[in-house]
Design a protein with these regions (language model features):
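Extreme N-terminal, non-catalytic leader segments
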Residues: 1-36
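Conserved substrate/cofactor phosphate-moiety recognition/catalytic segment
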Residues: 52-97
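The conserved Walker
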Residues: 43
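Hydrophobic anchor at the beta1->P-loop junction of P-loop NTPases
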Residues: 39
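Conserved lysine of the Walker
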Residues: 47
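Small-molecule kinase domains that catalyze NTP-dependent phosphoryl transfer to phosphate-bearing small molecules
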Residues: 139-195, 202-218
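Conserved beta-strand scaffold positions in the cores of enzyme catalytic domains, especially
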Residues: 67, 133-137, 179-181
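ATP-dependent NMP and nucleoside kinases share a basic, alpha-helical "lid"
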Residues: 76-83, 87, 99-158, 164
């Protein structure tokens, strides 16, 4: 049986089970709304550096936030994926689903992924259907990214050691209508972090958490 056939069979017979504690309940407990900031841009543009500093500032404010870093994810959850077009798509599909779980759990997720293709980013936006999803384009020229090259990856890619490397031997499609642009060739790190924090304060954190009654608990075991 093919993989696609197995997936269709599982999808047909697996039933979603709702929790008795909702996302809204968790947001009320946390005293803030949850949501996803999706940082896209070339390697070395500054995505993870900015996101981790934003996370630290949110932590100081007692706001629950978590960074998903593209390299870190490939050490575990996505360690079986490469960098072909198909694997890149699956890499982002998995992250979108995990991000949804974290957002449902009440977190502000800061996802840092090159995510070079517009259709993949559009898929992620559609999965959240406008539900506190915001795309942040961390903009930086390929020349500047090569100059920075903190991991030495561009050097290897230019020498042909690393294939399918975004910006060198694989394309990066710039966002056409991102929710926020951070140009790290123009803005310093402190200003970049503050810009994201200000953006959060006017979007995800601006909404008032509203109360609701908890889902009635079952009186008997059903499964």
């Amino acid at each position: 049986m093919s993989k696609s056939s197995c997936e269709k069979m599982v999808s047909k017979h697996v039933v979603w089970l709702d929790s008795y504690v909702t996302r809204q309940d968790r947001n009320i407990l946390n005293k803030h709304n949850s949501g996803l900031l999706w940082f896209t841009g070339l390697s070395a543009a500054g995505k993870s550096t900015i996101a981790h500093l934003v996370e630290k500032e949110l932590f100081k404010r007692e706001i629950r936030a978590y960074v998903f870093d593209g390299d870190n994810i490939r050490h575990g959850l996505n360690s079986n994926l490469g960098f072909s077009r198909e694997d890149r798509k699956e890499n982002l599909r998995r992250i979108a689903e995990v991000s949804k779980l974290f957002v449902d759990a009440g977190f502000i997720v800061l996802a840092c992924f090159i995510s070079p293709y517009r259709d993949d980013r559009a898929y992620i936006r559609q999965r959240f259907a406008g539900d506190n999803f915001f795309e942040i384009y961390v903009k930086c020229s390929i020349a500047e990214c090569i100059k920075r090259d903190p991991k030495g990856q561009y050097d290897k890619a230019l020498k042909g050691i690393i294939p399918n490397y975004t910006g060198v031997s694989a394309p990066y499609e710039e966002p056409e209508n991102p929710d926020l642009i951070i140009n790290t060739e123009v803005m310093d790190l402190t200003s970049s972090v503050q810009r994201v924090l200000d953006f959060l304060d006017h979007t995800i954190l601006a909404g008032k958490t509203q109360g609701r009654d908890l889902t009635p608990l079952p009186t008997s075991i059903k499964g």
